[in-house]
């Protein structure tokens, strides 16, 4: 998550929309983990090394011309749901050493990174959130570990021929208008997953309602190219675009 000034500009602009109340279910126990990958039974979870080994094998397939991204995402979902992350030593260490260092922003720990994919732990205080942003040429799976969050996914519907300029922190930005289509809105609870692909639901936001911890897998990993191409959106979710269900007008900034 680089390009902090652009992100903060959009985040500040989005505060007008962040006050919308959300009703989320309280959580008392962890959900049971599904064990669907390769016929495993319910008590045969993966350890950390096995988890990485299987994703490493799967992620290599992204360079094949007939790579099925949807099938890959489903396999990663199944792997994540076989993992008891709080029992992994590296995750235990991150949990134990947690400090809320970044006011109004989540804490990020990189659990594993290679060119083909990365695994991260994100920890949120109540009130911290990630506003709408995309992941160019990437696909990803979020796995909720503790807490709960409202997750919204969008796809770019069309660009609009409408721009304006605005200044923030001494820098002038051009705001470009577009229309986004909501593809999914869900409340994630422990053991549940949310997905995005490079072509569907690639723009998402995440708003926890309590202290929340999640693990995500992104393929390929973040690099200078996809970081530079990432866009942060301000979405007007109050009104449907042209009164069409699931369509919303949005703006994004170019410096």
Model segments located where?
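N-terminal secretory signal peptides and thylakoid transit peptides that target proteins
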Residues: 1-17
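C-terminal segment of N-terminal export signals and the immediately downstream linker at the start
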Residues: 24-65, 247-255
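A short glycine-rich, His/Asp/Glu-containing loop-to-beta-strand
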Residues: 101-126
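A short beta-loop-beta micro-motif enriched in histidine and acidic residues
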Residues: 115-117, 128-141
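Conserved short histidine dyad/triad with adjacent acidic residue
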Residues: 121-133, 199-200
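Glycine- and acidic-residue-biased ligand/ion/polar-headgroup-sensing regions
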Residues: 137-155
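Short acidic-glycine-tyrosine-enriched beta hairpin
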Residues: 158-201
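Double-stranded beta-helix
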Residues: 203, 207-255
